[in-house]
């Protein structure tokens, strides 16, 4: 009897050792996506109104046509050949992602982008419109005030200053879901897990960990991306099984670090552990100065002319001194960025340097531009 008890304790300790996470283990839910449970893209067209003279100009004909069609729906009839010239209106495209499992009445964020030649969408309001999927069906309704992160200022002579992108904005919770997208998650006999970052080692580790946790033949690695899992057929049991599955700790192996750059806002995010090989960096520095003044033209007293004011812009481009920076092998990228910042480089300059380092094979990381 004592031998049997000791044997049972041994199996219990062995099972605990197999389930306990290692130092580099991660929850399976953060490493994979479930096939069939995904977001779907939605798109729509509408008008943004209430702009302070920064809307589409007269040459954008479809904005006037859209405005006339909208007024006609409210019983306002315009003359047939009349082209409404409204500078406070801009034609826009609306895009959104419908997350998996979202039902009727839930809200999602939307992105509003100018189609015509509007200068800015700041302060505008999106009129009610339908958002459709790839099948042409309506899945959501969108409306709300546009939040713009960019700004554009323009002088009388045509010189202007633009910060970020003023013709693209967002509306948090700006769309209401009206139809749920069906999923085959409950109908398939197996559940397929797709690794977010494909790797043969990671796929094999996922299959081994699931077989240890739920029994042999529970999971099979099909490729570097897919892992097939046998799941219960009952809906409630399948949901409970998936909740346990997402918490299983997986040793995903070493993942390559990333450098992410947002081309719209100039934001640079550097992951931990990004290293650089030996290289030399030199980047030109251009400074553009625009000075604007108004000149007054006074006619002769007896000439019968009028006093006019003409704008004059003086644009000066200054090229700064190029400085070569030597980068020793094994240097962390964070130290390089700090050095580049000390030279007065902007985020766009930093991104240009990172792209050059990546193309030269000196950047040991994955470069992602969003």
UniProtKB/Swiss-Prot annotation:
Pfam families: FlgI
Keyword Transmembrane: no
GO molecular function, one term: structural molecule activity
GO cellular component: bacterial-type flagellum basal body, distal rod, P ring; outer membrane-bounded periplasmic space
InterPro entries (alphabetical): Flag_FlgI (IPR001782)
Record-annotated membrane-spanning stretches: none
Locations listed in the record: Periplasm; Bacterial flagellum basal body
Top-level taxon: Bacteria
Any one biological process term the GO annotation gives: bacterial-type flagellum-dependent cell motility
Keywords: Bacterial flagellum, Periplasm, Signal
Signal peptide positions (record): 1-25
Role played: Assembles around the rod to form the L-ring and probably protects the motor/basal body from shearing forces during rotation.
Quaternary assembly: The basal body constitutes a major portion of the flagellar organelle and consists of four rings (L,P,S, and M) mounted on a central rod.
Protein family according to the UniProt entry: Belongs to the FlgI family.
Name the UniProt record assigns to this protein: Flagellar P-ring protein 1
């Amino acid at each position: 009897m004592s031998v049997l008890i000791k044997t049972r304790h041994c199996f219990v300790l062995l099972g605990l050792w197999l389930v306990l996470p290692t130092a580099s283990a991660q929850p399976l839910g953060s490493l994979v996506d479930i096939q069939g449970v995904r977001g779907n893209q939605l798109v729509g067209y509408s008008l943004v109104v209430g702009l302070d003279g920064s809307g589409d100009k007269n040459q954008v004909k479809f904005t006037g046509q859209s405005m006339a069609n909208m007024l006609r729906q409210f019983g306002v009839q315009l003359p047939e050949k009349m082209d409404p010239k409204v500078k406070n209106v801009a034609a826009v495209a609306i895009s959104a992602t419908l997350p998996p499992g979202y039902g009727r009445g839930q809200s999602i964020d939307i992105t509003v982008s100018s189609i015509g030649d509007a200068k800015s969408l700041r302060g505008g309001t999106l009129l009610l419109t339908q958002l459709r999927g790839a099948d042409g069906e309506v899945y959501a309704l969108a409306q709300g005030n546009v939040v713009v992160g960019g700004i554009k200022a323009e002088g009388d002579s045509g010189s202007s200053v633009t910060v970020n992108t003023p013709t693209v904005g967002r509306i948090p919770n700006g769309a209401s879901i009206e139809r749920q997208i069906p999923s085959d998650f409950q109908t398939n006999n197996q559940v397929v897990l797709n690794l977010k970052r494909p790797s043969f080692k990671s796929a094999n580790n996922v299959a081994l960990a699931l077989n240890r946790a739920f029994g042999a033949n529970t999971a099979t690695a099909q490729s570097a991306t897919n892992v097939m899992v046998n799941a219960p057929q009952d809906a409630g049991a399948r949901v409970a099984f998936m909740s346990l599955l997402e918490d299983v700790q997986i040793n995903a192996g070493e993942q390559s670090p990333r450098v992410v750059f947002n081309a719209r806002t100039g934001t640079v995010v550097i992951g931990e552990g990004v290293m650089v090989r030996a290289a030399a960096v030199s980047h030109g520095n251009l400074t553009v100065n625009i000075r604007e003044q108004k000149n007054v033209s006074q006619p002769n007293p007896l000439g019968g002319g009028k006093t006019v004011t003409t704008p004059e812009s003086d644009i000066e481009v200054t090229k700064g001194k190029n400085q070569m920076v030597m980068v020793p092998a094994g240097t962390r990228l964070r130290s390089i960025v700090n050095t580049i910042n000390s030279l007065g480089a902007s985020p766009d300059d930093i991104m240009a340097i990172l792209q050059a380092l990546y193309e030269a094979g000196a950047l040991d990381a994955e470069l992602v531009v969003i």
